[in-house]
């Protein structure tokens, strides 16, 4: 996909190609196939949730985040950056349900401007489970796990 190729170029340009691995899958609550609506205005706004986009659609494979990490033999995530246009609750609730608290990511950077698309408020859950706000930007929030 164009977005993935652009992302890979940025990773290589910034010399992070040894530390960052990309996957051509989406993350969600279960293994399934979903339609991704491609935004012609802003590729980063392509969405599974917002099907009102007057755009082309492609089918993508969705995997639970815990399954993807297990497959890649990643047992602990220290920093999680997630920007999935309103699908954050679908990806994060199932992931946290599989974890012992000692394996929770230390930092999470996530978009919080799509809360109206969430079925459950993942931020409220994260705050109730030990996270606090470290910083906020336009549309994003950086939270840290209190020790």
Predicted features, each with a name:
Residues 1-147:
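Phosphate/nucleotide-binding beta-alpha loop and adjacent structural elements of enzyme active sites
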């Amino acid at each position: 996909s164009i977005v993935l190729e652009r992302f890979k170029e940025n990773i290589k340009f910034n010399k992070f190609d040894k530390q960052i691995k990309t996957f051509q899958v989406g993350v969600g609550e279960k293994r399934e196939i979903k339609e991704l609506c491609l935004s012609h205005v802003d590729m980063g706004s392509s969405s599974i949730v917002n099907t009102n986009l007057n755009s082309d659609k492609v089918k993508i494979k969705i995997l639970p985040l815990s399954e993807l990490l297990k497959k890649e033999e990643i047992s602990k995530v220290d920093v999680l950056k997630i920007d999935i246009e309103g699908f954050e609750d679908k990806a994060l609730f199932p992931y946290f349900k599989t974890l012992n608290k000692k394996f929770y990511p230390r930092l999470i950077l996530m978009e919080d401007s799509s809360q109206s698309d969430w079925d459950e408020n993942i931020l409220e859950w994260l705050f109730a489970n030990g996270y606090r706000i470290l910083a906020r930007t336009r549309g994003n929030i950086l939270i840290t796990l209190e020790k």
